[in-house]
């Protein structure tokens, strides 16, 4: 069935609007600041037969673009095999199993079948980052976990809502295995409500244009996305481009992990070969296949953002060589660092390879860490336990035309640090500092952007801090002769003494007492092009604004001021 261009455009925009409304509903109704303020969530529409991506909200985390279609695919397959009970109208499944198309345990997915005339037309699904899903440490970021069980509660696909009603028995099992369980029902209701709103809006779209027309439009959208991506790839010079990226350590063995990438471009297709990457690791920096593949998709979306979000956009890609490496984790390997950290190293490797081929389109490496900092304890003023989860921005890499953005969100999405006023209101902490990490941008013709420098103090009670970050050993890569960005630095300050974690950017279960402080300085982006070619007036302006000190400007840029 052919769909005329005008109708196709309207339906495509309508599907996007459905996803955007789900995103907004989820954020506005959520209880947790990490969802309501930091936007660590995503919503989308997926094919009934195989979970392929149809549309995804523009306000959600792009890293979920791949993982949510994989988790939906696993759900569909398990229903077909009888491992998971068959759906009925009003059912909503919950799943967070990383090995079934997921990321880490804190990313909890809901999936709801959308019914038309007694059959499933498509799936609506969303993901939200829960502040805690159990495990060794509050917040789930166990830097020294050596098995999945130590990271928290792992849920296979199971119905949390049956015919529109919350299954209290399943909910009690979940609540019995997570911290601050009394605070999660607000997020659960928000997550389910987002899907219900999506179903209402999608139903109106189908009523207006008809099921057959919308189905034909979806098929055409997928074909168009594939053609557009192939057209972009055809303009990339054929060749083999080799790059690598470094993960500081796995949190258990204090040695770097290597992501090796050979990007082979021929015609309208591209192969991403990760053979030679490090073996599976003991600690939580393993990556499940869905996250690895999604990170490649994400990186290519950064380079070619005009290609519509659809499964068709990824058809020209072949990803291989991950078997037997830490980029293809299987149970029971721990994986809490994969979604927020390893995924960004994978994207960095893709950028480092592609900048050799199309330097005008690809930047130097961004900060590439989400700055995961979890603080859990008891607040004597409220008489309640708490789990605080802080993410933070960093510098973007310079590019052919501009300096890198400062304090930008991470490579994997749009998540931003929650406002400190909200954090201070909700948790027993005080932010003593929140500023740019001066001097952190990598030197270059176009310098990297600057990271963030913040310091937070525990005001009362007792708490325990955990960190799973990266780029503490090696800063974000410069490109085409540019310098690397500054490394990530974590400090715990107690009675005037400064403690730096053994693994630099990873540690867990550090006890904090009132007056103890945590200071985090996130990386700057890599520089682009030789620093000696930077406009002297631009260097002088950076010095005037305090972005670099005079001595640093002379050393890095050869400034004569």
Give the predicted meaning of each segment.
Residues 92:
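Glycine-rich phosphate-binding loop of nucleotide-binding enzymes
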């Amino acid at each position: 069935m052919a769909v005329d261009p005008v109708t196709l455009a309207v339906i495509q925009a309508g599907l996007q609007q459905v996803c955007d409304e789900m995103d907004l509903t989820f954020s506005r109704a959520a209880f947790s600041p990490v969802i309501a303020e930091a936007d660590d969530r995503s919503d989308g529409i997926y094919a009934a037969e195989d979970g392929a991506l149809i549309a995804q909200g523009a306000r959600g985390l792009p890293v979920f673009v791949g993982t949510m279609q994989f988790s939906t695919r696993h759900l569909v397959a398990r229903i077909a095999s009888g491992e998971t009970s068959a759906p009925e109208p009003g059912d909503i499944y919950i799943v967070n199993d990383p090995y079934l198309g997921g990321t880490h345990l804190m990313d909890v997915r809901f999936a709801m079948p959308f019914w038309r005339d007694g059959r499933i037309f498509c799936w609506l699904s969303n993901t939200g980052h829960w502040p805690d899903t159990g495990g060794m440490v509050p917040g789930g970021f166990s830097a020294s976990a050596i098995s999945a069980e130590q990271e928290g509660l792992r849920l296979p696909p199971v119905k949390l809502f049956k015919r529109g009603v919350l299954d209290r028995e399943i909910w009690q099992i979940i609540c019995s295995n997570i911290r601050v369980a009394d605070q999660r029902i607000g997020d659960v209701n928000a997550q389910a409500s987002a899907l219900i709103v999506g179903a209402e809006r999608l139903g109106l779209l189908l009523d207006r244009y008809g099921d057959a027309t919308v189905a034909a439009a979806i098929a055409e959208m997928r074909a168009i996305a594939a053609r557009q991506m192939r057209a972009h790839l055809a303009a990339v010079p054929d060749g083999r481009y080799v790059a690598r990226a470094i993960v500081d350590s796995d949190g258990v063995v204090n040695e770097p992990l290597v992501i090796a990438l050979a990007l082979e471009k021929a015609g309208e297709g591209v192969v991403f070969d990760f053979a030679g990457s490090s073996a599976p690791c003991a600690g939580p920096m393993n990556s499940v296949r869905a996250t690895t593949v999604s990170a490649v998709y994400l990186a290519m979306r950064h380079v070619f953002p005009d290609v519509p979000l659809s499964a068709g956009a990824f058809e020209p890609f072949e990803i291989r060589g991950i078997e037997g490496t830490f980029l293809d984790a299987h149970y029971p390997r721990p994986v809490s660092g994969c979604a927020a950290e390893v995924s960004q190293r994978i994207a960095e490797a893709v950028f480092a390879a592609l900048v050799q081929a199309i330097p005008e389109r690809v930047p130097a490496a961004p900060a590439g860490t989400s700055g995961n900092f979890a603080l859990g304890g008891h607040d004597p003023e409220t008489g309640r336990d708490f789990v605080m989860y802080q993410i933070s921005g960093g510098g973007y890499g310079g590019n052919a035309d501009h300096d890198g953005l400062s304090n930008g969100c991470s490579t994997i999405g749009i998540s931003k640090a929650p406002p400190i006023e909200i954090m201070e209101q909700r948790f027993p902490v005080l932010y003593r500092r929140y500023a740019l990490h001066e001097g952190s941008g990598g030197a270059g013709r176009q310098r990297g952007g600057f990271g963030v420098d913040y310091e937070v103090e525990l005001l009362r009670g007792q708490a325990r801090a955990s960190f799973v970050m990266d780029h503490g050993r090696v800063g974000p890569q410069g490109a085409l002769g540019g310098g690397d960005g500054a490394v990530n630095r974590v400090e715990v300050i107690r009675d005037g003494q400064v403690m730096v974690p053994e693994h630099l950017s990873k540690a867990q279960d550090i006890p904090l007492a009132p007056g103890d402080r945590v200071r985090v300085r996130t990386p700057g982006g890599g520089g682009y092009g030789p620093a000696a070619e930077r406009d002297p007036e631009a260097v002088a302006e950076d010095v005037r604004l305090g972005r670099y000190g005079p001595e640093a400007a002379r050393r890095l840029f050869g400034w004569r001021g």
